[in-house]
Amino acid sequence: MTSTKDKTAITPTRENDYPEWYQQVVKASDLAENSPVRGSMVIKPWGYGIWENIQRQLDDRIKETGHENAYFPLFIPLSFLEKEAAHIEGFAKECAVVTHHRLEEKDGRLIPAGPLEEPLIVRPTSETIIGDSFSRWVESYRDLPLLINQWANVVRWEMRPRIFLRTTEFLWQEGHTAHATHEEALQETMTMLEVYRSFVEDVLAIPVIVGEKSPGERFPGAENTFTLEAMMQDRKALQSCTSHYLGQNFAKGSNIRFSNMEGQLEYAYTTSWGMTTRLIGSLIMCHGDDDGLRLPPRIAHKQIVIVPVIPKPELEAQVLEYAENLAAELRKQIFYGKPLTVHIDKRDKRGGEKNWEWVKKGVPLRLEVGPRDINEQAVMVARRDQSPKNKQSLPKQQFVQQAASILEDIQRNYYVQAATYRDQHIYRHLETFEEMRAFFTPKNEEKPEIHGGFVLAKWCGDPVTEEMLSDLKVTIRCLPVKQSGTKGRCILTGREATLDAIFAKSY
């Protein structure tokens, strides 16, 4: 983190008040705002442009693995959820329930009327409603695998909302698949986990730990839940996505059966996996600095912004023509298979004001062009991965040819910076529960947000022991897929243990 002595665009800084810094970055970068409905947000064009890029690029990867998109109802009959007692237990307190189907006016006010015969649940997740369709679509092993994805909104009533991180309504994609064998379904679970990992690390430049959830953190009704865990700059964990192997549990509840190769009826093996708008919050907290958002070029929907510098009205046409020609040349350059996205800021504002707006919005490259640049056939270049004061004049043609490689360098820098920060704050030397308690106890009760980081330690695997962590507000984030295989002592009980586990506070 930068020194608080430096003048910054965002107040307070991360060090001074991390939660408020986050809220101010959301506001200053014009990503989103709160709505009249508590816990729901308005995603503004700058924020939604990021989500559209996430959608486009992730959707391509999902389809490359053989999945197709479909859409299922927002409303789920209560009876569908009652079939899955273990599943709904995890969502019951968060469900929004529709009980009436119309409004009537009474004494000048509108009141609900027309009670429904059966209450409807506003989609918290879609396993049950999609399972109902799967039960009709699957008859034979020849109908499998069934590989479906849905882009939709979800409602989970949130008592402590925070924009992008925890909202009552959020956007996501949810994949649902059915398979003939346990092996195929488990392979699907891991395949999609790898799709997520490569997307989050390669496109969003967020380093993650790939692992399996402990029983206490597992998706309700799943046999296995796999996750990607990222470290934010307050050293808390943020779950970036999950991929669930559901076994035959949901197939039995939804009666998804097929005739196998021997002609016998068998329940299908299913999976589900999802990623949400929470990723935008992860981008902010992983890459943002005390001047605002910093967008990795591969996810930025405006990779380059040109700010014309017009000292006199009579020079406006000449400067704008130079800017238009520069933009046209840049758009011919290819970055990861697509033309560079370039925007010319023609608003009637002072150059300095416009520059700082784009700094706060996180645009990877800012360019200034004015009369001097025209005379020298040059361009003034500022990179978002460097100090806003750092500007370099480059020959125009040289910059055009180097633009894509500069963006690639910025992309790489963001990943390396985040990975270095994470690795510096994973602690491997703690051995006892008392040491863990001391590690996670805030040194300053008035500012408890920024604590030590992640603890990598041995765990005995006993689900009961997870309850010991509740008063510390710590959870087992995951059991890393890459296990050391060494023996040691469980940090919670002192018993012999072989499992490596990541312990952390989280969002």
From Swiss-Prot:
InterPro entries registered for this protein in UniProt: aa-tRNA-synt_IIb, aa-tRNA-synth_II, aa-tRNA-synth_II/BPL/LPL, Anticodon-bd, Anticodon-bd_dom_sf, Pro-tRNA-ligase_IIa_arc-type, Pro-tRNA_ligase_II_C, Pro-tRNA_synth_II
Gene Ontology cellular component list: aminoacyl-tRNA synthetase multienzyme complex; cytoplasm
Major subcellular location class: cytoplasm
Source organism superkingdom: Bacteria
GO terms (BP aspect): prolyl-tRNA aminoacylation
E.C. numbers: 6.1.1.15
Record GO terms (molecular function): ATP binding; proline-tRNA ligase activity
Reaction(s) catalysed by this chain's protein: tRNA(Pro) + L-proline + ATP = L-prolyl-tRNA(Pro) + AMP + diphosphate
Subcellular location per the Swiss-Prot or TrEMBL entry: Cytoplasm
UniProt keywords, alphabetically: Aminoacyl-tRNA synthetase, ATP-binding, Cytoplasm, Ligase, Nucleotide-binding, Protein biosynthesis
Domain notes: Consists of three domains: the N-terminal catalytic domain, the anticodon-binding domain and the C-terminal extension.
Sequence similarity: Belongs to the class-II aminoacyl-tRNA synthetase family. ProS type 3 subfamily.
Subunit structure, as described in the record: Homodimer.
Protein purpose: Catalyzes the attachment of proline to tRNA(Pro) in a two-step reaction: proline is first activated by ATP to form Pro-AMP and then transferred to the acceptor end of tRNA(Pro).
Protein name: Proline--tRNA ligase
